[in-house]
């Protein structure tokens, strides 16, 4: 029989469980899945906002939004569209009931346990699809899942459970690379946003001067060719700094320092075409963006809370 077995609301930042259903089936298979719930809660920040983990006879689905993740355990044959529609209802109700200040400042596990009442009622509705089908419209969710299907988490990305390495890890040596591609950065700060805008401005200024250099190149004997290359390299470096500021990549800090070095070299070469204030502005912005890239790190691992 296809059905939802349990659901939880977890804070993404540190894996703190905020609320959960309390009548979870106590079979051995479900208890094993609770371990996967616990492991996933530690790594929510590393995954996209819509994911599925298949554990054999059961599936764990979750969505994340505004720093909170909504997780559910269901049987393997439970329809995906119903699963994510269920999670979407939990998300809408939770956001309506609790503001971000409360969720961000919560310190005790299950401090919103009263939300369990809504989880239970919604779970009962979704475990009776005949009565449910006349009350909700699943077409939008079906289209959304078709256009943007949930990320299928390989078992090896969870690492080990209770010190015992998962058997699936042997077949998934590249898991670290997959996970890092979806890792999230800490929320952007005001200084980070300013750095992003200034870097775009420097890139635009370099691009404009590069096109002017092309015009001069067409009218001269080719002496402006090297300046044109320097301007376009400066543009590429500024845009790449914007990319590093927004997205997580491997060796991110090293890449940012190398990019800053390229910005400095380009401005040294363009010394004759820019005054000291222009050079100071471009180099200072490059240094400021590099600092912001270094400060905005990947979200850390969560502590060990039971879910």
UniProtKB/Swiss-Prot annotation:
Please give the residue ranges for the topological domain Cytoplasmic: 2-187, 248-253, 296-307
Q: Which GO terms describe its biological process?
A: endoplasmic reticulum to Golgi vesicle-mediated transport; protein transport
PROSITE patterns reported for this sequence: LONGIN
Stretches assigned to coiled coil: none
Q: Point out residues bearing the modification N-acetylserine.
A: 2
Could you tell me which CDD domains the record lists for this protein?
A: Longin
Lineage top rank: taxon: Eukaryota
Q: Which segments does the topology annotation call Lumenal?
A: 209-226, 272-274
Annotated membrane topology is: Multi-pass membrane protein
Q: What is its main location?
A: endoplasmic reticulum
Give compartment(s): Endoplasmic reticulum membrane
Q: Which Gene3D superfamilies match?
A: Longin domain
UniProt keywords (A-Z) are: Acetylation, Coiled coil, Endoplasmic reticulum, ER-Golgi transport, Membrane, Phosphoprotein, Protein transport, Transmembrane, Transmembrane helix, Transport
One Pfam assignment: Longin
Provide the Longin domain boundaries: 8-119
Instruction: List modified residues, type Phosphoserine.
Output: 6, 8
Q: List the disulfide bonds.
A: none
Q: Which residues cross the membrane?
A: 188-208, 227-247, 254-271, 275-295
Look up the record and report any one GO term of the cellular component aspect. endoplasmic reticulum membrane
Q: Could you tell me what this protein does?
A: May be involved in vesicle transport between the ER and the Golgi complex.
Similarity section: Belongs to the synaptobrevin family.
Read off the PANTHER family from this record. LONGIN DOMAIN-CONTAINING PROTEIN, VESICLE-TRAFFICKING PROTEIN SEC22A
The protein's name in its UniProt record: Vesicle-trafficking protein SEC22a
């Amino acid at each position: 029989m296809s059905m939802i077995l349990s659901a939880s609301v977890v804070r993404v930042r540190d894996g703190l469980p905020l609320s959960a259903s309390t009548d979870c089936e106590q079979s051995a298979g479900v208890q094993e899945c609770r371990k996967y719930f616990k492991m996933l809660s530690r790594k929510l920040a590393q995954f996209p906002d819509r994911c599925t983990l298949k554990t054999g006879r059961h599936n764990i689905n979750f969505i994340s939004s505004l720093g909170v993740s909504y997780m559910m355990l269901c049987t393997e044959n439970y329809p995906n569209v119903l699963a994510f529609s269920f999670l979407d209802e939990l998300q809408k109700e939770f956001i309506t009931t609790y503001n971000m200040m409360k969720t961000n400042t919560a310190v005790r596990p299950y401090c919103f346990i009263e939300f369990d009442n809504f989880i239970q009622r919604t779970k009962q509705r979704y475990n009776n699809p005949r009565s449910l089908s006349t009350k909700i419209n699943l077409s939008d969710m079906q289209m959304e899942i078709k256009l943007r299907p949930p990320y299928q988490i390989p078992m090896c990305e969870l690492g080990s459970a209770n010190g015992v390495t998962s058997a699936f890890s042997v077949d998934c040596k590249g898991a670290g690379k997959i996970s890092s591609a979806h890792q999230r950065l800490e929320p952007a700060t005001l200084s980070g946003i300013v750095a992003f805008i200034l870097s775009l401005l420097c890139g635009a200024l370099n691009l404009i001067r590069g096109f002017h250099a092309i015009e001069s190149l067409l009218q001269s004997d080719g002496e402006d060719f090297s300046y044109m290359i320097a301007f376009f390299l400066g543009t590429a470096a500024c845009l790449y700094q914007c990319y590093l500021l927004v997205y997580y990549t491997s060796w991110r800090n090293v890449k940012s320092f190398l990019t800053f070095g390229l910005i400095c070299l380009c401005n040294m070469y363009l010394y004759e075409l820019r005054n000291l204030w222009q050079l100071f502005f471009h180099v200072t912005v490059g240094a400021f963006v590099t600092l912001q890239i270094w400060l905005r790190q990947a979200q850390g691992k969560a502590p060990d809370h039971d879910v």
